[in-house]
UniProtKB/Swiss-Prot annotation:
Family recorded in the similarity comment: Belongs to the RecA family.
GO biological process: DNA recombination; DNA repair; SOS response
Main location: cytoplasm
PROSITE patterns: RECA_2 (PS50162)
GO cellular component, one term: cytosol
Keywords for this protein: ATP-binding, Cytoplasm, DNA damage, DNA recombination, DNA repair, DNA-binding, Nucleotide-binding, SOS response
Protein name from the UniProt record: Protein RecA
Biological source species: Streptococcus salivarius
UniProt signal peptide: none
Gene3D superfamilies: P-loop containing nucleotide triphosphate hydrolases (3.40.50.300)
TM helices/strands, residue ranges: none
Cell compartment(s), UniProt: Cytoplasm
Length: 104
Protein backbone atom coordinates (compact mmCIF):
# COMPACT_ATOMS: atom_id res chain seq x y z
CA UNK A 1 0.00 0.00 0.00
CA UNK A 2 2.82 2.40 0.87
CA UNK A 3 4.70 1.75 -2.38
CA UNK A 4 1.51 2.22 -4.39
CA UNK A 5 0.88 5.53 -2.59
CA UNK A 6 4.37 6.62 -3.68
CA UNK A 7 3.48 5.89 -7.30
CA UNK A 8 5.13 2.48 -7.67
CA UNK A 9 3.36 0.22 -10.18
CA UNK A 10 3.09 -2.86 -7.96
CA UNK A 11 1.92 -5.02 -10.87
CA UNK A 12 5.27 -4.55 -12.64
CA UNK A 13 7.52 -4.60 -9.56
CA UNK A 14 9.91 -7.55 -9.34
CA UNK A 15 11.06 -8.43 -5.83
CA UNK A 16 13.69 -10.99 -4.94
CA UNK A 17 14.99 -12.17 -1.58
CA UNK A 18 18.05 -14.27 -2.45
CA UNK A 19 19.64 -16.84 -0.15
CA UNK A 20 23.17 -15.51 -0.68
CA UNK A 21 25.02 -12.53 -2.05
CA UNK A 22 26.13 -14.49 -5.10
CA UNK A 23 22.55 -15.49 -5.86
CA UNK A 24 21.38 -11.88 -5.53
CA UNK A 25 24.10 -10.63 -7.85
CA UNK A 26 23.31 -13.39 -10.34
CA UNK A 27 19.64 -12.36 -10.35
CA UNK A 28 20.59 -8.70 -10.80
CA UNK A 29 22.93 -9.67 -13.64
CA UNK A 30 20.27 -11.67 -15.46
CA UNK A 31 17.76 -8.84 -15.13
CA UNK A 32 20.26 -6.31 -16.46
CA UNK A 33 21.41 -8.60 -19.31
CA UNK A 34 17.80 -9.20 -20.37
CA UNK A 35 17.23 -5.51 -21.05
CA UNK A 36 13.70 -6.05 -19.75
CA UNK A 37 14.10 -3.69 -16.79
CA UNK A 38 15.14 -0.05 -16.63
CA UNK A 39 16.12 0.00 -12.95
CA UNK A 40 17.67 -2.50 -10.54
CA UNK A 41 17.94 -1.62 -6.84
CA UNK A 42 19.93 -3.70 -4.37
CA UNK A 43 19.04 -2.94 -0.76
CA UNK A 44 21.25 -3.59 1.06
CA UNK A 45 24.75 -4.54 -0.01
CA UNK A 46 25.57 -5.14 3.66
CA UNK A 47 22.93 -7.91 3.70
CA UNK A 48 24.59 -9.72 0.77
CA UNK A 49 26.25 -12.54 2.67
CA UNK A 50 28.72 -14.62 0.62
CA UNK A 51 27.83 -18.32 0.24
CA UNK A 52 31.13 -19.35 1.89
CA UNK A 53 30.17 -17.42 5.00
CA UNK A 54 26.72 -19.02 5.10
CA UNK A 55 28.11 -22.53 4.62
CA UNK A 56 31.21 -22.11 6.81
CA UNK A 57 31.64 -22.56 10.52
CA UNK A 58 30.96 -19.56 12.71
CA UNK A 59 34.61 -19.40 13.77
CA UNK A 60 35.96 -19.31 10.20
CA UNK A 61 37.61 -16.10 9.03
CA UNK A 62 35.86 -14.45 6.10
CA UNK A 63 37.81 -11.19 6.05
CA UNK A 64 37.30 -9.31 2.79
CA UNK A 65 35.09 -12.00 1.28
CA UNK A 66 32.13 -9.69 0.71
CA UNK A 67 34.35 -6.95 -0.71
CA UNK A 68 35.89 -9.39 -3.20
CA UNK A 69 32.45 -10.71 -4.15
CA UNK A 70 31.14 -7.19 -4.81
CA UNK A 71 34.28 -6.10 -6.67
CA UNK A 72 34.11 -9.09 -9.00
CA UNK A 73 30.36 -8.60 -9.55
CA UNK A 74 30.75 -4.92 -10.38
CA UNK A 75 33.40 -5.72 -13.00
CA UNK A 76 30.99 -8.19 -14.60
CA UNK A 77 27.89 -6.00 -14.31
CA UNK A 78 29.39 -2.73 -15.53
CA UNK A 79 29.60 -3.84 -19.19
CA UNK A 80 25.98 -5.04 -19.17
CA UNK A 81 24.83 -1.88 -17.42
CA UNK A 82 26.56 0.24 -20.05
CA UNK A 83 25.20 -1.84 -22.95
CA UNK A 84 21.58 -1.94 -21.77
CA UNK A 85 21.58 1.55 -20.18
CA UNK A 86 19.97 0.03 -17.09
CA UNK A 87 20.18 2.10 -13.93
CA UNK A 88 21.67 0.09 -11.06
CA UNK A 89 21.46 1.43 -7.51
CA UNK A 90 23.33 -0.34 -4.73
CA UNK A 91 22.38 0.82 -1.24
CA UNK A 92 24.79 0.20 1.61
CA UNK A 93 25.11 1.17 5.25
CA UNK A 94 27.79 3.05 7.12
CA UNK A 95 28.48 1.83 10.61
CA UNK A 96 30.38 3.82 13.16
CA UNK A 97 30.70 0.89 15.56
CA UNK A 98 31.67 -2.53 14.26
CA UNK A 99 29.31 -5.28 15.40
CA UNK A 100 26.31 -3.02 16.00
CA UNK A 101 23.48 -4.27 13.78
CA UNK A 102 21.03 -1.36 13.99
CA UNK A 103 21.80 2.26 14.76
CA UNK A 104 25.02 3.59 16.18
Amino acid sequence: AYARALGVNIDELLLSQPDSGEQGLEIAGKLIDSGAVDLVVVDSVAAFVPRAEIDGDSGDSHVGLQARMMSQAMRKLSASINKTKTIAIFINQLREKVGIMFGN
